[in-house]
Curated annotation (Swiss-Prot):
This is Homoserine O-acetyltransferase. It is found in: Cytoplasm. InterPro entries: AB_hydrolase_1, AB_hydrolase_fold, HAT_MetX-like. Its EC number is 2.3.1.31. SUPFAM superfamilies: alpha/beta-Hydrolases (SSF53474). PANTHER family: HOMOSERINE O-ACETYLTRANSFERASE. The active site is at S155, D329, H362. The keyword Transferase applies.
């Protein structure tokens, strides 16, 4: 059901649209693809900005005062960036965020009802980032939105944004890729693989067939997967500052694995308590099969697939680009963003690589809006010439080969 709310300075659309038959990259066809979106502000024909959400994010990119019973990235996950008077100013722009296929916030995915009236489960077609982009394009067509003023994405949403520059290069004027990369490295691929195995090893997963009130969900496996994710999203420095080796005290929570009798002798540390809390909250809001589907889509993405190089993949894109990276992010490093900036430069595409000094790890793009907002807002308004936009290139327009991106942490597990 479509809902539109209008308050001073803010208009919000929230809807789920049936875009009809949709063929996935795998060749499988869904007869009726449902796509959930939210849009903020007024469309004037030229001011549309598409925001691509992160792995477990939703279309609820900004708050509108009516959310209840949701948490994490399901609820206003970038509310300090999107809204009236903010970096993506909804007084000026028509900001759209689309829940991607395979997710579980209204767009068709494994938990959605299939043709037989039962949830799809693992019979749902495999999804790729390319599938996300094409579904977004069809949703925008339905809304009457043609060329986009900007596409903005963080984390895997940045990969989604990059895919727009490849699949629909003429449809994007400005591209902002925040805390992302052209592909995952082998360490992140390995961590994602272990996270998926945590889910599929949970007896309650049952081959993906766990839906129904009379069945238990694989919450333990999904929780472990989320805990791995949180370790990947934080930096060593931020974890040490936040938790250290402090004991949380057992209280009523106990250990995550109470069957281990030796655990009673040892302290239950604050970092464990934090991870257990995050696991519990995540299992309440997210679907385990969706986590499998979306991590595979992220792992599969490679900007240069089908091309000789990243630069060749971007050759048709003539718009301006902003890359934002964070020095403490080892999930998507500053070096990866600099390599991507080099690909844009090799095809003479206007690009700025803005490096943010931060020790908050990958989560910095969510938790430090005061550092992300100014360059992002100025770029969307003014392009790479925006006042708050900096670049790693020298005055001559070439990258500074001597640039050090300290303090980069290559891994939480380095010695």
């Amino acid at each position: 059901m479509s809902r539109t709310r209008t308050t001073p300075g803010r208009r919000v659309e929230s809807d789920v649209v049936d875009i009809g038959e949709h063929e996935f990259e795998s060749g499988e066809i869904l007869p009726d693809l449902q796509v959930a979106y939210e849009a903020y502000g007024e469309f004037d024909g030229q001011n549309a900005v598409l925001v691509c959400h992160g792995l477990t994010g939703s279309q609820h990119v900004a708050g509108h005062g009516t959310e209840s019973g949701v948490s994490g990235q399901a609820r206003a996950w970038w509310g300090d960036i999107v809204g009236p008077g903010k970096a993506l100013d909804t007084n000026d722009y028509y900001v759209i965020c689309v829940n991607v296929p395979g997710s579980c916030y209204g767009t068709s995915g494994p938990a959605s009802e299939g043709p037989d009236g039962e949830p799809w489960g693992t019979d749902f077609p495999p999804v790729t980032v390319h599938d996300w982009t094409r579904a977004q394009r069809r949703l925008l067509d339905h809304l009457g939105v043609g060329r986009l003023h900007a596409v903005v994405g963080g984390s895997v949403g940045g990969m989604n944004a990059l895919d727009w520059a490849v699949q629909f290069p003429d449809d994007v004027e400005r591209l902002a890729v925040v805390a992302s990369a052209a592909r995952l490295d082998s360490q992140c691929l390995g961590i994602d693989a272990v996270a998926r195995r945590a889910i599929t090893s949970d007896p309650n997963w049952n081959g993906g067939d766990y839906y129904g009130e009379d069945r238990a969900s694989p919450d333990a496996g999904l929780g472990l997967a989320r805990q791995l994710g949180h370790l990947m999203y934080l930096s060593k420095d931020s974890m040490e500052r936040k938790f250290g080796r402090r004991s949380a005290g057992r209280g009523d929570r106990g250990d995550a694995f109470p069957s281990d009798p030796a655990a009673a002798f040892f302290p239950y540390r604050e970092v464990e308590s934090y991870l257990d809390y995050q696991a519990e909250k995540f299992a309440e809001r997210f679907d385990a099969n969706s986590y499998l589907y979306l991590t595979r889509a992220m792992d599969d993405f490679d900007l240069s697939e089908g091309y000789e190089s990243d630069a060749a993949a971007l050759a048709a894109f003539e718009g301006e680009s902003l890359l934002v990276s964070f020095t403490g992010d080892w999930h998507f490093t500053t070096e990866q963003s600099e390599s991507l900036a080099g690909a844009f430069r090799r095809v003479d595409a206007p690009v700025a690589h803005h490096v943010v000094e931060s020790d908050h790890g990958h989560d910095a793009f969510l938790v430090e809006p005061e550092k992300v907002g100014p360059p992002l807002g100025d770029f969307v308004d003014e392009g790479v010439a925006g006042r708050a936009v900096t670049d790693t290139a020298t005055d001559g327009g070439e990258p500074d080969e001597e640039k050090d991106f300290a303090p980069v942490h290559s891994s939480l597990f380095s010695r």
